[in-house]
Amino acid sequence: MKNVTDSFVSLGHWSSAGSFGLNTDILATNPINLSVVLGVLIFFGKGVSDLLDNRKQRILSTIRNSEELRGRAIEQLEKARARLRKIGMEADEFRVNGYSEIEREKENLINATYNNLERLENFKNETIRFEEQRAINQVRQRVFQQALQGALGTLNSCLNSELHLRTISANIGMLGTIKEITD
């Protein structure tokens, strides 16, 4: 024990000449070093321990937050995938319905065009029949006029004034008979 106290006393006598000396006395140097290290650990250990605890809590808090964010991100990813699948199915459905709608519209357009062509064909046929009938009537009228003119020409060339007077008298006589019958 005397050596320990002597080593503390000898600390005060060291010269500050700037040179380090090698103390080979193990018993004198180890307790001093140990006491300094223990003192530093005890003095600064509480602060370091608190600092490490705070750091540990921040790291754990960051890990928990990261795990929560990861969980939310995974959840959002699953929702997005489900929505993408749903939208994909709806797109396929719209595509199929669109194609069937296009086919239906195409069929309706073809049917409407066919009906229009059929109506136009009927109208054309009616117009042709009407024009044929009109042409036939014009030909009949022309033939009748020509026949009438021919008959009048024949009558005028064959009639003389005596035949003409007899025809007029016969017609007047027929009119008189008709008048008597009706009265």
From Swiss-Prot:
Is-annotated flag, keyword Cell wall biogenesis/degradation? Answer: no
Q: Provide the Gene Ontology terms for cellular component.
A: chloroplast thylakoid membrane; proton-transporting ATP synthase complex
What HAMAP family does its record include?
Answer: ATP_synth_b_bprime
Q: Which domain of life is it from?
A: Eukaryota
Which InterPro entries does this one have? ATP_synth_b/b'su_bac/chlpt
Q: Which residues cross the membrane?
A: 26-48
Topologically, how does it sit relative to the membrane?
A: Single-pass membrane protein
Q: How does it assemble?
A: F-type ATPases have 2 components, F(1) - the catalytic core - and F(0) - the membrane proton channel. F(1) has five subunits: alpha(3), beta(3), gamma(1), delta(1), epsilon(1). F(0) has four main subunits: a(1), b(1), b'(1) and c(10-14). The alpha and beta chains form an alternating ring which encloses part of the gamma chain. F(1) is attached to F(0) by a central stalk formed by the gamma and epsilon chains, while a peripheral stalk is formed by the delta, b and b' chains.
A Pfam family cross-referenced in the UniProt record is ATP-synt_B
Source organism per UniProt: Drimys granadensis
| This protein's UniProt keywords | ATP synthesis, CF(0), Chloroplast, Hydrogen ion transport, Ion transport, Membrane, Plastid, Thylakoid, Transmembrane, Transmembrane helix, Transport
Main location per UniProt?
A: plastid
| Family per similarity comment | Belongs to the ATPase B chain family.
Q: Provide a Gene Ontology MF annotation, just one.
A: proton-transporting ATP synthase activity, rotational mechanism
Q: What does this protein do?
A: F(1)F(0) ATP synthase produces ATP from ADP in the presence of a proton or sodium gradient. F-type ATPases consist of two structural domains, F(1) containing the extramembraneous catalytic core and F(0) containing the membrane proton channel, linked together by a central stalk and a peripheral stalk. During catalysis, ATP synthesis in the catalytic domain of F(1) is coupled via a rotary mechanism of the central stalk subunits to proton translocation. Component of the F(0) channel, it forms part of the peripheral stalk, linking F(1) to F(0).
Q: What is this protein called?
A: ATP synthase subunit b, chloroplastic
Q: Add the further remark from the entry.
A: In plastids the F-type ATPase is also known as CF(1)CF(0).
| Keyword Membrane (UniProt) | yes
Compartment(s) of residence: Plastid, Chloroplast thylakoid membrane
